[in-house]
Amino acid sequence: MLMVISPAKTLDFETPPTTGRFTQPQYLDHSQELIDQLRELTPAQISELMHLSDKLAGLNAARFGSWNPDFTLDNAKQALLAFKGDVYTGLEAETLSEAQLDYAQGHLRMLSGLYGLLRPLDLMQPYRLEMGTRLANARGKDLYAFWGTRISEWLNEALADQGDDLLLNLASTEYFSAVKRSSLKARIIDTEFKDFKNGQYKIISFYAKKARGMMSRFVIEERINDPEALQAFDVQGYRYNREQSTPDKLVFLRNIAED
């Protein structure tokens, strides 16, 4: 089973990594192509394109300017340990053992607007480039056009390396839209996490993102390769709901949201 998750806007390049092991991103030639284009933008243009404050636009202009694909532990960090959003709060990668990191390296991928597809131990430098950014480029009007079918092809390669054809989608709609379902040689399992609020079950973004991270960790800890085994996920009150689920869409409900 191969899992895909979204990246995060929040990054942590201050905390030392919990492992000294790392790999290099596999598709840096494509990243360099984007960086070359982004370097031509002024901070004001970055602000308008990405809807950022002047301060954040200036920060990311500087990041694009200093980006260097010769990644080391001195100028980069392992992707799974660098991202610090709600998904990664649920995943708690900093507490994974070396053996669990090994398993994650083979079974988890992070979608990325700049890097395309990252393995957990792939080094990355800080950036901000959401997949939904409408950055016109030589391949089309936005990043979906830029990546085209490449991400799907790379996922197919990763699945072939595993000898598997099962893809667990734990990414947001924005990011999984960069995966061309028709190009995947895989059975896709989608997930939904709903909390009870105001008399009904609904997807609450913060909780759903955290739950995707918790599900990722559950798969890593239990080394799950059977989709039916995913139904046992019961972390922090979530329970599989058979009535709302289908074989290819697993729905988990929780009656009391966390404070």
Curated annotation (Swiss-Prot):
Signal peptide: none
Entry-linked Pfam families: H2O2_YaaD (PF03883)
A GO cellular component annotation in the UniProt record: cytosol
Cysteine pairs bridged by disulfides in the record: none
UniProt record, GO biological process: response to hydroperoxide
Alphabetical list of InterPro entries matching this protein: YaaA
Homology family: Belongs to the UPF0246 family.
HAMAP family: UPF0246 (MF_00652)
Protein name per its UniProtKB record: UPF0246 protein Psyr_1064
Organism, scientific name: Pseudomonas syringae pv. syringae (strain B728a)
